[in-house]
C-alpha cells in the first residue's frame, strides 16, 4: 500500500510549523521545529525566496495533505466528494478529512499521532458500532461509536496515548470514555473548531484553475 515515507520532522520543517506528526515528541523540546525552525536541505537556512502564486496554492494543499497523512489520489477523491456535497466545499473538505477513521481514532486518543492511529486501524484494533473496520479512509458518521478492541486497549502504547490525549482535552465534536477505550463521534466539526493555519480556500482555487 502506498504511503508517504518522507521523514515526519522534515515535513514539519518544510511547512515552518508543527504539524504534530510524531505524537508526544511534538510537545517536547526535542521537536525538530524547536531546534531547527528553518527549512530542511543544504540551503534551508538561506531559503527566503518568494513563492510564485502557484507555489503558494500548492504549499497550502501540501500542508493539509501532510497534516491528515493522505496521498494525492486520496486527497483528490476527498475534494471531489466535498465539492459534490451541499455547503461550502472547503469546510466540507476538512470535515471529511476529520471524519476519516484514522483521524477520528487519533482525536479520541487511540494513537499518539495520526500515523500511529492508522496503524491501529490497519491491525484490526478498531470497532465501529461493534463491527471491526480496518480501512483508515472509512468515513465515520455522526452518532457512530468507535472503540478499541480488547487486545488494542490492553497495549501499553494505546494506554499511554489515551492518557496523554485526556490530559490535553478532547475536541468538542467527540466524547470519549477513557476507561472503556470508547468514543462517540457526536457531530462533524465546525470550521471554527479546526486549525486556523489550514487554508482550504487556496486549495479550492488551485483545483479550479
UniProtKB/Swiss-Prot annotation:
Oligomer status and interactors: Part of the 30S ribosomal subunit. Contacts protein S5. The interaction surface between S4 and S5 is involved in control of translational fidelity.
This protein's encoding gene: rpsD
Similarity-based family: Belongs to the universal ribosomal protein uS4 family.
Residue ranges of domain S4 RNA-binding in the record: 99-160
Cited function: One of the primary rRNA binding proteins, it binds directly to 16S rRNA where it nucleates assembly of the body of the 30S subunit.
Protein's name in the database: Small ribosomal subunit protein uS4
Alphabetical list of PROSITE patterns matching this protein: S4 (PS50889)
Gene Ontology molecular function: any one: rRNA binding
Organism: Dechloromonas aromatica (strain RCB)
Keywords recorded for this protein, A-Z: Ribonucleoprotein, Ribosomal protein, RNA-binding, rRNA-binding
Gene Ontology cellular component list: small ribosomal subunit
HAMAP family reported for this sequence: Ribosomal_uS4_B
Single biological process term from Gene Ontology: translation
Stored InterPro entries: Ribosomal_uS4, Ribosomal_uS4_bac-type, Ribosomal_uS4_N, S4_RNA-bd, S4_RNA-bd_sf
NCBIfam families registered for this protein in UniProt: PRK05327.1 (NF003717), rpsD_bact (TIGR01017)
Amino acid at each position: 500500500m502506498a504511503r508517504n515515507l518522507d521523514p515526519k520532522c522534515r515535513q514539519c520543517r518544510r511547512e515552518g510549523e508543527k504539524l504534530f506528526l510524531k505524537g508526544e515528541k511534538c510537545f517536547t523540546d526535542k521537536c525538530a521545529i524547536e531546534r531547527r525552525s528553518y527549512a530542511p536541505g543544504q540551503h534551508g537556512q538561506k531559503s527566503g525566496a518568494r513563492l510564485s502564486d502557484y507555489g503558494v496554492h500548492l504549499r497550502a494543499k501540501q500542508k493539509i495533505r501532510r497534516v491528515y497523512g493522505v496521498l494525492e489520489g486520496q486527497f483528490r477523491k476527498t475534494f471531489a466528494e466535498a465539492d459534490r456535497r451541499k455547503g461550502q466545499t472547503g469546510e466540507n473538505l476538512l470535515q471529511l478529512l476529520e471524519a476519516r477513521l484514522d483521524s477520528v481514532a487519533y482525536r479520541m486518543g487511540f494513537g499518539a499521532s495520526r500515523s500511529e492511529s492508522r496503524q491501529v486501524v490497519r491491525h484490526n484494533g478498531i470497532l465501529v458500532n461493534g463491527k471491526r473496520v480496518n480501512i483508515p479512509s472509512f468515513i465515520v458518521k455522526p452518532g457512530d461509536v468507535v472503540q478499541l478492541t480488547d487486545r488494542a486497549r490492553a497495549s501499553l502504547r494505546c494506554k499511554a496515548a489515551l492518557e496523554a490525549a485526556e490530559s490535553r482535552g478532547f475536541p468538542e465534536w467527540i466524547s470519549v470514555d477513557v476507561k472503556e477505550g470508547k468514543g462517540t463521534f457526536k457531530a462533524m466539526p465546525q470550521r471554527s473548531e479546526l486549525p486556523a493555519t489550514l487554508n482550504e480556500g487556496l486549495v479550492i482555487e488551485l483545483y479550479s484553475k
